Amino acid sequence: MEPGSSVARSKRASRIAACTALVLSAGMLLAAPASADAPAPAPAGAAAQSTAELGGQPTLSLPKRAAKKKSGASGVAGAQSPSSVVPAEPRGDLDGDGAGDMLYRGLDGGTYAVTATSDSHPYTIDSDDPYETPKDIITPGDLDGDGKAEVLTLSASGTLSLHPSGGADGTGRVTWSGNGWQKYNKVSAPGDLDGDGRGDLLARTPSGDVYVYISTGDVTGAPFEAGVKVGYGWNVYDQIVGANDVNGDGLGDIIARTPAGDVYFYAGTGDAAKPFKARVKAGYGWDIYNQLISFDDLDGDGLGDIVARKPGGALYTYLSKGDGTFAARVEGGTGWNAAALFAGAGGNPHWGKQELEARTEGGSLYWYQSRNNENFFPRQLDSSDTGWNQVSLSLASSLDNDGWGDLLQVYNGTLYVGAEEIGTGWQVYNSLTGPGDLSGDGKGDVLARDTNGDLYLYQGNGLGTKFAAKVKVGYGYDTYNKIVGAGDLSGDGLADVVARAKDGTLYLYKGTGDAAKPLSARTEIGTGYNIYTHFAAPGDLDGDGKADLIGVDGAGDVYRYSSTGTGEIKKRAKIGYGWDIYNGLY
């Protein structure tokens, strides 16, 4: 089955059905003339559904692997002699054949693997909660010397869990978990940084500080030593790729990219206290890619290579030359926008919402999922129950652990999250926004604005069942006619908020991760946005891990505004039309 199957989608659909029944049981009379929402042509602008994401496999064409050598760096200036070292072992060898494999999360939330002997197939991460969607998946390699590569999962709330390998089809049960990792916006597996033959971890904070976690060889008690700060200023990069051994010295290396597309090589030193040499520029123009990925050595020469993906889903392979630079790219496959997340990808992982809900004038709800290629899939009917016009709606970035948006519904002053009744008195608010985690605990939160313009933070409990007592975090927000957010626009990994003033000026409020003051001072990012009847935050539309925005004008034309990852947005691109049949977009 393709990465687009129905397990997670079925869960979402049942939530909508459940919440519909709940609201009905609360006394809501939804009987309406059938003509109130007569079937209308589906809004256009999206391609038909015969796509790689919904049936059939993405194509993959990687270099043919040669017999493994001691090193492929012979004859390259600055590279190691082939007789001096044995190349680093692959970190993502799922099936034990000595070669790195591909592990990724599909657009349905399921995990999939590709090995040398098997095309894309379901890969089961053994978890107590089958509906939990990890925020990131990391392959550090064989940490205990048993010949099998371990797999790490990182939850949105900051729990890093270690799974022993279960072969090409899945992992074993968790042997260790550690909390507090939500303080980092990127956790990477660069390979062996201290020369002991085991893979280590690199973690970056939103402010750009870098920490190294050295592996201990104990996969049950304490698999990593305490983190040690080894650098700062790494927030200049929007992609940090743990590349394993790029130059043939057996040590882990890093490939890092700036938002402008410049690529830098950090060679490992073998010294855990100072693990990298000074950076060397290795390329430019790489901003055409939305993800840089490492699958270890692709061609069998013992050197770590890079795979790059374009927004349309095309893959390109860059084979290492042994000195931190790469040979000319080679086409590597198509349709890989089907991967919402690659293990080994360089971007900050986006999690929580890649979708929209749209409400028709007759009160039906339609669901639009991000296609991960700058567009949406064709709409799907979420609820044909008429009468949703009597409910105040907002689609919040995930408030539980499944990674899907949660529908906030206020009816007669009572707030429901999906099928869960939260409480009464919510009629005092005229805007609810769920941009993600604003308090720094990794759990989705909600911002509520009252009729006086005061802004309140409701911290989520990570289950979507309860909020902490409200905290006032701002005032004067009645100057805005739209407040939206679904992830990070500024590149620091923290959830941000965008507000549109009544005169059409657009402002960005960067998230701080501090519950007491969750938003920084506003910055203007555009004008003229009052041309849009609807303005919404669907999350990441183009696969780069950064939150994007859309606007629908009075004619029903749909425009995407992709984030640059620097607190600005790109020029608009038209992606659809006919959306004037909707009176609400969330």
Give, region by region, the residue ranges found by the protein language model:
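Trp/Gly-enriched beta-strand/coil motifs that build multi-repeat beta-propeller-like domains
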Residues: E2-G4, A8-Y586
